[in-house]
Amino acid sequence: MQQNNGNAKDEYQTDNGYYCQKWVSKYDTYNRTTDQITYNRWCFPYMRLAELYLSYAEADFEYSGTLSTASLSYLNKVRERCGLPTFADSWAKAGGIPSGEKLREILHDERSIELAMEGRRFHDMRRWKIAHTEMMR
């Protein structure tokens, strides 16, 4: 969908209107007159603290079959950062925190959502041994 003068050089939006701004510095600028982009140098995180928290919760679940108090605390830190209710509060409306395979799926979803656009999904699917089904959808 083009909403400018028809010149592709002046196009400033994506096909669907959504644009991922994860890892884009708010100080980066684009000058349309000179067609110059000014990038701000910054350190790209190889691993975020949220990934460590999610990995801990997942490992704790795989080891014990349930979530410990520490795991719930770490999940809540990740959710609190983006303004979501706590894990227990979210699942209280559905009858409480699930267990077993359903909890595993929920932890996978939490990880997929938090780490979206970071290049982790394929390796997670291989680690979870679901790549052969997920990639064939």
Specify the residue positions occupied by each region the protein language model found.
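Acidic/polar-rich alpha-helix caps and helix-coil junctions
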Residues: 1-137
